């Protein structure tokens, strides 16, 4: 079932609810930069077969969510939107444990939510989380983006990561030709995503305490595996696990071995439920 969750007069989040009878738990999915919920159909189906209900939504500025396309005013909007989705899901499913899965920028959103709201979920799963400054904005380029993104917020910047998302050519081709994928975003958006939000994480990373599974492809060219390793080493969680996948690129859930990875995620969720 697809519908819209109204946040305010200017923003309504498009979401999909794929629920099973008597779910063992619920998983809320935060997709990555430029993505939309349609790219997680196979993930949803896999979780449903394992007895897990799934809620996913197009992040602000993305997909078919009703908001300015490719733009946000502040990274804090991602945290507040995510919180509204969590409250909505919990109100609809009283007493059912809730987990959150975030990929790439969605992993950043998930991590920030975990820092800001440490008591709402049973645990989180992060896939290639973009929680630190990435190669395109290191050094002088980051300084330029910081200035341009602050002073000329509405200038558009092209999505330059398209060829590096996955080692499966069909996935890359589908991504490039997907009308719901963002192929550009504003400088203001990129500043909030690539600079301001990672600064928030760096400042508050030790406050993150959720049980967490972090998964990362060793050949990730978009978010280097060192970023995931840094997060794992610096969060305050006692219950944490890091899995590195040799030969996999950024979108591990679109690589050919994705069923095995999803099985691992399901097993981890069920393990948390037994504790």
Language-model features: where?
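Catalytic active-site module of serine/aspartate enzymes centered on a nucleophile-bearing elbow/loop
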Residues: 241-275
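Conserved alpha/beta-hydrolase
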Residues: 39, 44-68
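Alpha/beta-hydrolase-fold enzymes
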Residues: 103-186
